[in-house]
Structure formats: structure tokens, C-alpha cells
Design a protein with these regions (language model features):
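Extracellular glycan-modifying ectodomains
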Residues: 1-274
């Protein structure tokens, strides 16, 4: 049989994301895209609590401020190795807040610098998990590189930035066996889904269909039977909650609402979400 596309071979992860897993997503807007699906499906997921963070230093800044979030699984989505340094203080800022560009110096982090910032974030999450005495298991970290290209760097510059992040991710996987794994969202988008029909109108961001496909590959890599059953149990409740009635005040619809709320309560009780 002839094949008309390359398919990324992704081995099954050596750990599983569980039902109603406690998770933290930090990184580029692709972290929002992926994390939103976990939130919509009732996982205990925190997604970019201090806004989108594009570079490894800013990801560390978020983790430092998230002492009350103790995830069992953390997902870091790396967008760029470019950082902006406030000249007055020498600090890397997470957001320039529309201040004049002359106040900042733009710099590219090296592979080792990217890996160092992320390693500090991993170590901090591990220590927070240990201090909490959590019985949910040891911390697992999933690193992925955002497939979204940065046109403002030029396409060659964008590729150099992504290459730096890919090397940093590989370094972290090798130095943290059993803790850090790499999910190839970047490769899926640029190999399996390389056709422009999988992009939005700006020709840079993945379309909703592309994000959905990457979500399905993510599930196939990290979900076990418990997480899939969790999704299956929640799906009809979610669909019922999103139902738009023609006659919202009717007795029939009020009965439907009451029945749906009872199913939701039973679901939350079953998975200890109350």
C-alpha cells in the first residue's frame, strides 16, 4: 500500500495520566490549547495561571509563584529561547507591558541556559510535591516544543530558536530519567500535518482540527484505561450541560436539567471531585 505522509512514531509513555489527574500547564499559547482540553474534561488542571509564558526563564517564574499548586503531572510547552531583559534591573521580564522597546535588551538563551531554568522549575515542583506528603505518586514532567513559528524572527531565526529548545528538551530527558518525557507536538505539526489546511488563516497557528489531532496523539501516549473511562463517563454529561433548548422554561427541560445535575453529582462523587 502506498503511503502519502510520514507518521511520527511515539512510544507509549512509561507512566499514565490518571483519572481527574492533578496537572499544571505552563508555557506558550499552545499550552493553553492543550490545557483547555483537560479543563473542559474535568481534570484538575491549572493552565498558565499568570498568563502565557514563552521562554524557559518565564516558565520558571510561574512555577516559583505556584507554591499552592502541587501537580502530579506538569506540562511545559516551550515557545522561544528569546528573552527580554529590563536594562534598569537586569531581570528577565515575562511581559513588556507595552513599555518602550528602548528599555529592554533582547537576548537568546543558550541550550544550557534553557535547560538550567527548566531544571530549576522541575526541582522546585519535586520539592513542593515531597513537602506536601502527597500520596498521588512522584512528579512527572512532560516537555513539548510549541509548533507555532515566530515570523518576527524570520523563518530561519525561528528554526534556530526551536532547535535550541529541542536540544534543551533532549538534555532534560537524558538527565532526568523516569521523571521527564518529551512529547513531539512540534514534529507532528511539521511532518504529519505539514499541509497548510491544518493552519489557521495566519498560516502560523495550528487549526482547531490540528490541535484536536495532537490532543488525540497525546491521549494515546499518556492515557491509560482509567483516564479513558473518566473521559467516557464525563462525555454525555458535558454534552447535556452544553445543550441549547428551544423552550428553556418548559417542564420537560427543567426535568432534563435536574437529571443532568444529578448525574454530574454522581460523577464528581465517584472521582472525588466534590
Amino acid at each position: 500500500m502506498m503511503r502519502f505522509r510520514t507518521e511520527i512514531d511515539i512510544p507509549k509513555a512509561d507512566f499514565e495520566i490518571g483519572a481527574a489527574e492533578r496537572m499544571l500547564f505552563v508555557g506558550s499559547c499552545f499550552a493553553d490549547n492543550l490545557g483547555r482540553r483537560f479543563v473542559e474534561n474535568r481534570f484538575r488542571a491549572t493552565v498558565n495561571p499568570f498568563g502565557v509564558m514563552y521562554n524557559p526563564a518565564s516558565i520558571l517564574h510561574t512555577v516559583e509563584k505556584c507554591s499552592d499548586v502541587r501537580p502530579r503531572v506538569a506540562v511545559f510547552t516551550l515557545g522561544t529561547n528569546h528573552v527580554y531583559i529590563l536594562k534598569e534591573t537586569g531581570e528577565i521580564v515575562d511581559n513588556c507591558q507595552k513599555r518602550p522597546q528602548r528599555l529592554f535588551e533582547e537576548r537568546e538563551l543558550s541550550v544550557d541556559e534553557c535547560a538550567s531554568y527548566l531544571q530549576k522549575a522541575i526541582n522546585l515542583l519535586k520539592s513542593q510535591t515531597a513537602a506536601s506528603g502527597s500520596s498521588e505518586g512522584t512528579l512527572k514532567v512532560i516537555i513539548t516544543v510549541s509548533p507555532i513559528r515566530y515570523a518576527k524572527y524570520g523563518y530561519h531565526g525561528s528554526q534556530l530558536s526551536k532547535a535550541t529548545l529541542l536540544l534543551a528538551a533532549d538534555k532534560l530527558v537524558k538527565e532526568n530519567p523516569g521523571v521527564v518525557s518529551y512529547f513531539p507536538a512540534y514534529e507532528i505539526m511539521n511532518d504529519e500535518l505539514r499541509d497548510y489546511r491544518f493552519y489557521k488563516e495566519d498560516m502560523l497557528h495550528p487549526s482547531e482540527q490540528a490541535v484536536e489531532y495532537i490532543w488525540e496523539r497525546f491521549r494515546a501516549t499518556y492515557f491509560g484505561k482509567a483516564a479513558e473511562q473518566f473521559l467516557e463517563d464525563w462525555r454525555p454529561i458535558r454534552e447535556a450541560l452544553g445543550h441549547k433548548p428551544f423552550h428553556p422554561e418548559s417542564e420537560e427541560h427543567q426535568t432534563f436539567i435536574a437529571r443532568t445535575e444529578e448525574k454530574k453529582r454522581q460523577f464528581e462523587e465517584k472521582y472525588h471531585l466534590l
